[in-house]
């Protein structure tokens, strides 16, 4: 994908990110749906700016991705981040399906994991840090509600560092789906699949790797041998910020039941569930969410540095 020639009217890369690409510095992509739909203002904008600073301190270059005025942007200004934070749910949530239409209409759009992967690949960025990937929703055997993130992971050559799939999802079916499409699910220093707010779940990852170097080597071999598609690196939330399983699961079960009662479906379901869980936990889940993003940004920076070292 990085070989495609994209018009600068469609894709703009910030000077900081351009410099990183030109001089072979490690870059880390960041999504923008977490800003507009994942957290309330002003925590959303503050967190996004602090995550960028965290990546810089690790010796990598952050590249927050969004659509601004119909332009796919790789690297946002603070004003653009704050715009997305203030506008919140008024900003269109953009996955693969929506991308051409939001760009063509000249609108603002917040990128999901799937569309962030697409734009990162267009720019030549191989590592992406987020909170949690989308997955198979609970009740998908009736609704077929499966996040487009999973198909993107099957097809697009970007490594996604996350705290597992969001725990509002069906984690068992999500792992099965990833296995079917040949997506490696790597546990960073763990064999148990992290469950976003919790460090463990009843499900296992496909392989445990204990260092950024091992992960970077696997990325290089995978893509050099023509095995297209992404890798998921599941990084457990730090222990001091993890939530008790009983309380978070009770909040999730209640939120899922309320979503069903209110007919919340499709791309609105995840923002609804995360916001409702935050309310039900008295804001504790939001605090955990913020901390796990920082943790993932640090690991993603280390992986990006190692991959860049191998790539030369």
Where are these regions (language model features)?
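Glycine-rich nucleotide/cofactor/substrate-binding loop typically near the N-terminus or early
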Residues: 32, 37-39, 45-101, 224-240, ...
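N- or domain-start disorder-to-order transition segments that initiate the globular core
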Residues: 1-24
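Active-site glycine-rich loop that binds ribose-phosphate moieties when present
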Residues: 110-112, 141-154, 158-179, 212-217
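Solvent-exposed alpha-helices and their adjacent loops that cap or buttress functional pockets
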Residues: 19-22, 27-28, 57, 119-122, ...
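Anionic-ligand binding region
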Residues: 198-224
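General beta-strand structural signal in soluble alpha/beta enzymes
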Residues: 28-30, 62-67, 103, 109, ...
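A C-terminal functional module that forms or caps the active site or interfaces directly
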Residues: 227-295
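A glycine- and small-aliphatic-rich helix-loop capping segment at beta-alpha/alpha-beta transitions
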Residues: 42-48, 80-85, 135-154, 177
């Amino acid at each position: 994908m990085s070989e495609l020639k994209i018009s600068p009217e469609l894709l703009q890369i910030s000077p900081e990110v351009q410099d990183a690409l030109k001089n072979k510095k490690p870059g880390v992509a960041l999504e923008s749906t977490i800003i507009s739909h994942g957290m309330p203002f002003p925590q959303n904008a503050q967190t996004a700016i602090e995550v960028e600073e965290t990546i810089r301190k690790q010796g990598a270059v952050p590249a927050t991705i969004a659509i601004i005025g119909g332009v796919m942007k790789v690297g946002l200004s603070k004003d653009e981040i704050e715009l997305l934070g203030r506008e919140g749910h008024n900003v269109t949530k953009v996955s693969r399906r929506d991308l051409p239409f939001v760009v063509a209409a000249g609108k603002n759009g917040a990128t999901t994991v799937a569309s962030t992967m697409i734009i990162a690949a267009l720019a030549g960025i191989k590592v992406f840090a987020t909170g949690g990937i989308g997955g198979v929703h609970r009740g998908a055997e009736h609704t077929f509600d499966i996040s487009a993130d999973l198909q993107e992971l099957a097809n697009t050559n970007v490594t996604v560092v996350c705290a597992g799939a969001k725990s509002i999802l069906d984690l068992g079916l999500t792992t099965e789906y990833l296995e079917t499409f040949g997506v490696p699910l790597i546990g960073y220093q763990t064999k148990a699949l992290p469950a976003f707010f919790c460090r463990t779940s009843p499900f296992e990852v496909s392989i445990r790797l204990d260092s950024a170097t091992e992960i970077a080597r696997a990325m290089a071999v995978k893509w050099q041998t023509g095995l297209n598609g992404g890798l998921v690196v599941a990084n457990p939330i730090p222990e001091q910020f993890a939530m008790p399983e009983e309380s978070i699961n009770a909040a999730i079960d209640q939120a899922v039941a309320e979503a069903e009662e209110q007919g919340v479906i499709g791309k609105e379901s995840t923002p609804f569930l995360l916001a409702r869980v935050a309310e039900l936990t008295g804001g504790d889940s939001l605090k955990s969410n913020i901390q796990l993003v920082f943790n993932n940004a640090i690991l993603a920076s280390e992986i990006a540095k190692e991959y860049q070292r191998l790539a030369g």
